């Protein structure tokens, strides 16, 4: 076997648009510096079993145009070599047998953790860097830095939602669109806000330790009632799939239409959140005499292997170049990032959450101006609705309830509502989400009340 220095590249986790651009950029940089590059097929799958035959030499001719395409040129796998000490040992030994002294891993938080443990186990024999990838956008990067693939996934998700919104209006129905994002609501919120969905629900907005299923259902019901009072029978809610992980398992266990294991426990991963909410919302509307057609739709898999849009192609070219250049310059044990147009290596040790021992997860900041603006454009029951007797009377009449009855049913929904938007002239006119104050040009009473009654979705 040749003793020439070798750089290995592998991809873990789920697909994301832009993977091939990272592979291509890193390969070109390394080859031009005289280093052989091998693509390791199917992530850690074969290495962890001690197999070294599933590799392919990457050349500039092979990869020079793959950046236009989605998917992964060298495959992908969710195999986790850290689950068993022997698998991690096999992975290190397999890489050494392949004469790989430098490794680029491409993946999300789980692959980042595997990269950390692999580098630690290799003890200087293999230098490792990680390129963050996930359409969930939940890796612990600065708030203004996206993970690659997110923008392409959002772009394609918005196209899907746009068409569904037209269908909803045409057919007078509601869509419950469940978007990928098991740990954070970035993708759901990004799609919903950009598309102008009627409302978007993410796990971060429910601040209790456990999400009450009734609160999720009533938020959707309140939106339907409010929308109907404006003369619109249609709407579209974008819902982050991660909500299901926060719902009390005992509430899910009480449902009839969920999959269970041999011991009768609910299979969380198999919960069809859209269908469950569709059934519960329809049932909740019955006492109010409201009938509406609801269609549940999952989107996610059709986003993961989309061809990357130019912003992700350019971004991943930067990441791939920097990953290879950093290793070739003697660097080790960092996650690659681009911040403000500059390469910023983030040491592995800074990625770990001391409480979990795993890579940190970046959640949606529900106290940010971006989120506050998103909330103001949603049609859902708000605090100012309950303070306006005329509006409240319309909603109560639509539900066939008195004002007091409507309050008893729904006013608990506003307990954790973020404060309204204000302009702070003391900070150069920056918009902040905080309670209105005397003398502020925008207080709760004058804040944007959302789209006009007959406005778009």
Predicted regions and their residues:
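Short glycine/serine/threonine-rich phosphate/pyrophosphate-binding segments
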Residues: 16-26, 47-48, 85-87, 106-116, ...
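N-terminal phosphate-binding or glycine-rich loops at protein starts, especially the Walker A/P-loop
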Residues: 2-51
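Short, ordered loop/turn segments at secondary-structure junctions
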Residues: 12-14, 35, 40-45, 78-79, ...
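Accessory alpha-helical/coil subdomains and C-terminal extensions
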Residues: 37, 94, 102-107, 113-117, ...
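C-terminal non-catalytic interaction/assembly regions of soluble proteins
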Residues: 252-445
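Glycine-rich oxoanion-binding loops at beta->alpha junctions
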Residues: 48-101, 111, 135, 145-159
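A short, small-residue-rich loop immediately preceding and capping a beta-strand
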Residues: 6-14, 19, 100-110, 176-177
